[in-house]
């Protein structure tokens, strides 16, 4: 038997993969999709669906979010009034069979960019999935911040159609933000 044939017949060996083998360390996060506790003032849900270029749900994706708190400060920032027990700043949710995800959070406050320019309240979103060799990065902006959105340095660089793909829509318990990977209504992604 050749070495190659032996590798395919010996139980317990990891099969070769394009980007593998799979290493799941730290995939489940401690807080999962809960950026804030349920009792946190202003707690809301950001829910959505991830769709491929044909409009089909992506059932095995991972949505990660990072954001500032309502005061515009990130978790771990110095300050006496930050409650690190109830605000984590990070959420992670696997998409279900219908491509849906949900993150419990609060609406973030505006933050300053590295060059000091005030940015509109937003949530950073990373998306990982089978078939993607690199993660996709986008942002969620809020429809009730028209003045801040009109001045946001990143949003103003985009054409009006791309800009609309980054603005969530209000829902009964928070906001809805669908992520479209390709096609006519493709979400704007950033290459950073």
Pin down the residues of each PLM region:
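Beta-strand-dominated extracellular/periplasmic modules and repeats
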Residues: 1-192
């Amino acid at each position: 038997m050749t070495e190659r044939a032996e590798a395919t017949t010996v139980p317990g060996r990891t099969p070769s993969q394009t980007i593998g083998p799979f290493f799941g360390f730290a995939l489940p996060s401690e807080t999962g999709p809960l950026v804030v506790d349920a009792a946190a003032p202003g707690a809301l849900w950001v829910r959505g669906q991830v769709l491929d270029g044909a409009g089909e749900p992506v059932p095995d994706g991972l949505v990660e979010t990072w954001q500032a708190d309502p005061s515009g400060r990130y978790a771990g920032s110095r300050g006496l009034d930050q409650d690190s027990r109830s605000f984590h700043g990070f959420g992670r949710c696997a998409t279900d069979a219908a491509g849906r995800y949900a993150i419990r959070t609060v609406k973030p406050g505006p933050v300053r960019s590295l060059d000091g320019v005030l940015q509109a309240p937003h949530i950073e979103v990373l998306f990982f999935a089978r078939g993607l060799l690199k993660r996709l990065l986008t942002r969620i902006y809020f429809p009730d911040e028209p003045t801040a959105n009109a001045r946001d340095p990143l949003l103003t660089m985009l054409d009006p159609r791309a800009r609309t793909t980054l603005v969530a829509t209000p829902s009964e318990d928070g906001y809805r933000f669908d992520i479209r990977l390709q096609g006519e209504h493709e979400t704007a992604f950033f290459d950073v």
